[in-house]
Amino acid sequence: MTSAERVAVVGTGLIGTSIAMAAVRAGDAVRGFDADADALARAAERSGLVPAGSLGECVSDATIVFVCTPIPSLAGLVAEALSAAPGAVVTDVGSVKSHVTSQVLAEADAAHLARFVGGHPMGGSERSGPDRASPSVVDGIVWVLCGTERTDPAAVERLAAWIERVGASPVRMDAERHDRLVAVVSHLPQVASTVLMGLAATEEAGEPEILLLAAGGFRDLTRLAASSPHLWSDILLGNREQIAHALELYTGRLLEMRDMVLAERARDVESAFAQAKEARLALTAKPQVKAGVAVIQVPIPDRPGVLAELTSALGEAGVNIEDLQIVHSPEGGRGTVYLTVAADAAEEAERFLRARWFEALRLA
């Protein structure tokens, strides 16, 4: 088992405090610093971290430093932490990697760059602040690591070992590839959600009842529109070229759909929906990236208490649910639950569920 680390967290918002909570739970000593004294005090109360009066005090004896501040300040603080913590691996948690990495390479002392590893935990929420933090924010997520040509591979491996110890899955890739991929699966969804919500709000001026008709689908699609405007402005500008390309691809697909609808090409419309449905169901059913888990598919009727019956059955079997996702049928009346459990518990889970008349089927 990996030995305990001395963790320093610079920036105690949602992600920073969640990392602190995960580290404390894993048995690490944790110090934190934030320029906002109130945020630091709330983070200390929630996570158990020891508050520091300065960045230097926070990182002085750390072995791993997480810089968890807004994107514009990341590079400068990473450079400062590298100098103030001569024995520590220093990483950031920014959603944009190429821009931040190039700034770090330009600003930090070249002698310290072997200890810098760019990072991006693929977790979070539309909520913000230390009061919303939880170790579950990083538990089970993919955590991208982007070393540079100057990074010591041992620094990457040390950070990866810590990430695995707190229950996340490290994935190594270069910064440019990271930015291209997250532009599609992380940044574009935020833009689409924001634009759709803005469109509906504008239409409300002429049609006051439009949002009264907004049901579950609209609410699901616009959840991200409640995210921090300041945070997302920094992210979009920091990854502007990749996001612009993703928007071009997305706009092209929307225009294709418009043309198919106007031309009454029913088969093409149905085919587009079918392909997307198949891809979405495959995404839902995929197991966690981490090894040793299994996914069980369970169709359920739409009635009160059925989900409690399902989870109670697994509780009686002593099976821990690592993840649970629900896909609702468009026709209503039924849904499908996808359960992620430990691979060595999957057979027992299936047996208990079938004994209670659930049609459990192991997918992976």
Role assignments for model-derived ranges:
Residues 36, 137-226:
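Internal alpha-helical scaffold of NAD(P)-dependent oxidoreductase catalytic cores
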Residues 206-276:
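Interdomain hinge/lid region at the active-site interface
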Residues 35-36, 94, 327:
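Residues in the short beta-alpha loop(s) of Rossmann-like NAD(P)-binding domains
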Residues 1-59:
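NAD(P)+-binding Rossmann beta1-loop-alpha1 motif at the extreme N-terminus of oxidoreductases
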Residues 279-364:
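A conserved regulatory-domain signal marking ACT and ACT-like small-molecule sensing domains
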Residues 55-89:
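Rossmann-like NAD(P)-binding element
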Residues 77-131:
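Rossmann-like NAD(P)(H) cofactor-binding subdomain of soluble oxidoreductases
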